[in-house]
Amino acid sequence: MKTDTSTFLAQQIVRLRRRDQIRRLMQRDKTPLAILFMAAVVGTLTGLVGVAFEKTVSWVQNMRIGALVQVADHAFLLWPLAFILSALLAMVGYFLVRKFAPEAGGSGIPEIEGALEELRPVRWWRVLPVKFIGGMGTLGAGMVLGREGPTVQIGGNLGRMVLDVFRMRSAEARHTLLATGAAAGLSAAFNAPLAGILFIIEEMRPQFRYNLISIKAVFTGVIMSSIVFRIFNGEAPIIEVGKLSDAPVNTLWLYLILGIIFGCVGPVFNSLVLRTQDMFQRFHGGEIKKWVLMGGAIGGLCGILGLIEPAAAGGGFNLIPIAAAGNFSVGLLLFIFITRVVTTLLCFSSGAPGGIFAPMLALGTLLGTAFGMAAAVLFPQYHPEAGTFAIAGMGALMAASVRAPLTGIVLVLEMTDNYQLILPMIITCLGATLLAQFLGGKPLYSTILARTLAKQDAEQAAKNQNAPAGENT
């Protein structure tokens, strides 16, 4: 009897000790566990909103194209209607941005970078609806923009929204959930979870506070976002180019040449983006009426362009597989490349809510395919496949422009499911990055953020100067 009692007491003591250990562990790790839970919520919400954004944009595009099909036999109706529909959709996006949330204009990625440094505000209650509806208008109009910028900014703002809902006040939680939402947003846009993680670590490395809690939160958010995306869209790669052949070792030097070409193109492209932004700023001078009319004209132009040459309009996801398959001649590839450079500059630099990743991927594909086809003529003994150069070119322009080679490499490989091309991708992207840096090119998003902060400081200084003397004391 005594033995049974002693055994029972010993078991109770062990249970109490275990409970005490668990309680102390929970108390010690309460904040990290709460952050990880909220990261899962942020990732899930970002995945849901990202999928909804994609589906809504596709629906608007299909409705617009369906209306044009109805009058396809009447040219006197078709051309004006193509202009008017795209112009009206674009004007909705420009008006909402200018009137209610100027920070929702453009890509939105520089805004997230600024918010991570506590230099830009995060007003999720106005950015979320404006970015969603405005992006739906501009992308639905057929403008040369991508959905990755909106989903990254939407994801970051959802992170801040969750933080406010759960009433977390710590700077660590604020920073971590913002970064988690941004990573989940990129993953939701491209079905590329690893690229989403690398994007935060590489592109936002000056702003991202790397520690065990933050990186675990980013992982958690990206996992949830990717699961949601695949539930609705399946597990197939987002860009279907088929399985391409490996790049023989004796052709790798050609990829270095391609990287050098993109190393020259990247800084020039960035410079053109900034110059075009300045041109538009001088034109509208901040007046909402001029800004909206300008946006409508650009949107209408894209609508007309979509009738003349569909490959020259839109984000570019539909163009990439066609171009990579070698269905265009070298001359036509270069013509579409130049045309899309112009339309990308007009659409993105005007401040329309939309990203530039997808247009850059399309530009890289066009130039890479043209290079591959030329290489096949000049070096027939190598039997080069144009599609492999298209894949390498997709990541190279991003590497040279955004200065994120790792993200560019992994993003393209995840999107196309051609992991066997990792070596030529590394060679091309490294060559492009090194030459762009040597030529003095600056990362695009960092430069845009610096200009935004300079404008913010100038506006604040002007406000302080115009304020009554009593308000400044």
UniProtKB/Swiss-Prot annotation:
Residues 70-76, 233-252, 310-329, 377-386 are periplasmic. Proton-coupled chloride transporter. Functions as antiport system and exchanges two chloride ions for 1 proton. Probably acts as an electrical shunt for an outwardly-directed proton pump that is linked to amino acid decarboxylation, as part of the extreme acid resistance (XAR) response. Keywords: Antiport, Cell inner membrane, Cell membrane, Chloride, Ion transport, Membrane, Transmembrane, Transmembrane helix, Transport. SUPFAM superfamilies: Clc chloride channel. This is H(+)/Cl(-) exchange transporter ClcA. A motif (Selectivity filter part_3) lies at residues 355-359. It catalyses: 2 chloride(in) + H(+)(out) = 2 chloride(out) + H(+)(in). GO terms for cellular component: plasma membrane. Homodimer. A motif (Selectivity filter part_2) lies at residues 146-150. It is a multi-pass membrane protein. The chain crosses the membrane at residues 33-69, 77-100, 124-141, 148-166, 215-232, 253-281, 288-309, 330-349, 355-376, 422-438. InterPro entries: Cl-channel_ClcA, Cl-channel_core, ClC. A motif (Selectivity filter part_1) lies at residues 106-110. Residues 1-32, 117-123, 167-176, 202-214, 282-287, 439-473 are cytoplasmic. Gene3D superfamilies: Clc chloride channel (1.10.3080.10). GO terms for molecular function: antiporter activity; voltage-gated chloride channel activity. Chloride binds at S107, I356, F357, Y445. The keyword Cell inner membrane applies.
